[in-house]
């Protein structure tokens, strides 16, 4: 608890100091999914929820523009309603592919209002700079396919070579870590 008399470690945390824990917890959720243990998954999802609540509390205590857990939940509800007109309004989407296409279209309109009219043209727009390179490459290449674009083959080849190098480096790091256990 961050309340007076609560945990001193909790009390000194900031969004920045908590960021690595959020990333770590997300990876633990992925491991739990891959492991197929639903009890472990539930536990790890609880840890993600703790991160959300913790960040909201930090913001609330800092007086950051009335940002608290209610704000976070309200923004989520608003987004879900906006992006599901086939559920909450008179939109029509009867297949998962139609739902995904509608979601992307609505998201593009939202982002264009925030970031300018070039949202659809900018393949990197909205991709977090902190997203690992391999995942960023996957997202950009998926956008290219969805938009029916024909990218420069040399650029695609460079991306693929870089992804292969990343995978090799990741394998090397994992092998080195295994060596620490001996």
Task: Kindly label every feature range from the protein language model.
Residues 1-44, 50-182:
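Flexible "arm" and connector segments at domain edges
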């Amino acid at each position: 608890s961050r309340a007076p008399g609560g945990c001193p470690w909790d009390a000194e945390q900031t969004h920045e100091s908590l960021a690595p824990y959020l990333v770590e917890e997300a990876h633990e959720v992925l491991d739990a999914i891959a492991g197929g243990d639903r009890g472990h998954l539930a536990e790890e999802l609880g840890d993600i929820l703790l991160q959300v609540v913790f960040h909201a509390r930090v913001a609330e205590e800092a007086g950051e523009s009335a940002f608290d857990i209610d704000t976070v939940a309200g923004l989520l509800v608003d987004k879900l309603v906006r992006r599901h007109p086939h559920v909450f309004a008179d939109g029509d989407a009867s297949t998962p592919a139609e739902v995904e296409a509608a979601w992307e279209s609505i998201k593009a309109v939202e982002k264009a209002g925030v970031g300018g009219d070039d949202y659809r043209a900018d393949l990197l727009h909205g991709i977090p700079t902190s997203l690992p390179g391999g995942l960023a490459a996957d997202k950009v290449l998926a956008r290219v396919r969805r938009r029916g674009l024909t990218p420069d083959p040399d650029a695609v080849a460079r991306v693929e070579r870089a992804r292969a190098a990343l995978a090799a480096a990741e394998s090397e790091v994992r092998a080195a870590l295994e060596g620490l256990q001996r």
